[in-house]
Amino acid sequence: MRIVFLFSAWLLSFGALAAPGDVATLDRGTWPEQLTSPTLFDVASRAEILMFARVLLASESLDEVSLARRLGLRTINLDAVNSLRERMWQRLLTNYNFAQQSCDQDASFCFLVEDLPTLREQAAKFQVSDDSFYIKWSEPSRLFHAQYLDEQLRKAALFPQTSSEVDRFGDYERNGDEMHDRLFLLTFDSAANAIPDNTGWVAEYLRKSNINGTFFVLGKDVQARLADGSVASLQAMYSQQCLGVQGWEFRSHSHWQDWQDSVKRSAELVKSKLPENYVPLFRPPDGQRRSDAQGFFESQGLQVALWDIDPQDGAGKLKGSQSAQRVLTLMLLWRHGVINFNVKQDAVKTSMPWLIGQTAQSGIGWEDCQVAFR
């Protein structure tokens, strides 16, 4: 009875957590352990999976009108919302099964989960006792996952009228779903931006760390850099890194009449000037692209490169430390995927090094950008 009462009370509080548009972040200092081994990564991963599952389960109690109000929308695409929930449950089950493989080394947050019904059962019962070693983490984590779930459900509720990375239009679009457990790909948007010019610093940091990433560039930015410098200087800056395109300029490619020309011009420019770095990937600005574009992209030999983990480090959003802690929490939750940093903002110069340092002993890996999406 106590568990039922606690869960019911928590359901009532679900609707009064965060205003629509709030960006989720979590102070990782509330978690009492450093991720200094693969086992400790798994402990933290199990905790975040169970907390998110608890929040996800609670959201299913809201009817369509209540959910729309919760998300700050007049109408929602409930089919897209339910499809996202279903994909999330399957991913959570898979991830928990990976995370519980180390339960013989540390049994924290280890429960009997054999299938989706038992995961939902454990999510409904999940709570952290007041005398727990992890109590300081519990409520901040719950708030984080409630806000993060709102972000994702809102994108699904607007899909496909407003396209985003929340779902794919076909197999020609790729994200990190097919990546192996504990494997992540670093990607960077606006990666030829001139002011501020963080690209060279980021690329050099990656080289010194023996890591690479995929830098997505605008055609007009590459053209401007070539006007101010040489091809050789660009080749040196992007050495050992991969280059995809975001189109000629940063604008929605879903309703722009010249979107095809934007993609073709930028891809041809990068491929001709930086062939060793070029990878045939188009990242739609803000994830916005057309639903009927498969024929075009296949004719160009391009794939659409989406992402799974958004640092929310764009203009006016999270600062570097907040962004990094958000990313780490989502890495623990999803256990693999594509991370999407914004090189146009200075936050990346603090968030990325912190993230790489925090995970150095955790047993994760960074995907080779030349192998990703192949």
Q: Where does each model-flagged region fall?
A:
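Metal-dependent polysaccharide deacetylase catalytic core of the NodB/CE4 family, i.e.
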Residues: 116, 120-124, 128, 132-137, ...
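Short glycine/proline-enriched loop/turn "hinge" motifs that connect secondary-structure elements
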Residues: 176-178, 235-237, 330-331
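Alpha-helical scaffolds that organize eukaryotic protein assemblies
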Residues: 305-307, 312, 316, 329, ...
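Alpha-helical, coiled-coil/dimerization segments enriched in small aliphatic residues
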Residues: 189-190
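Terminal accessory/targeting
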Residues: 2-11, 15-186, 197-200, 204-213, ...
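A short, acidic, amphipathic alpha-helical segment used as a generic capping/interface helix at domain edges
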Residues: 320-332
